[in-house]
């Protein structure tokens, strides 16, 4: 999941560099959502293993 977040972040950077603001914003939002979801799942997995 971190891999997909990084891929979308790179797409956002490339799109913003090339002037595609809408695509860059959408890709950045997807990257942010995937990163937040991955961190939440990591924390849940970490806590469940400790119990």
From Swiss-Prot:
Protein's cellular compartments: Cell membrane
GO cellular component: plasma membrane
Main location (coarse class): membrane
Keywords tagged on the record: Cell membrane, Membrane, Transmembrane, Transmembrane helix
NCBIfam families attached to this UniProt entry: PRK13682.1-2
Similarity annotation: Belongs to the UPF0391 family.
HAMAP family assigned: UPF0391
UniProt name for this protein: UPF0391 membrane protein Pcryo_0139
Originating species: Psychrobacter cryohalolentis (strain ATCC BAA-1226 / DSM 17306 / VKM B-2378 / K5)
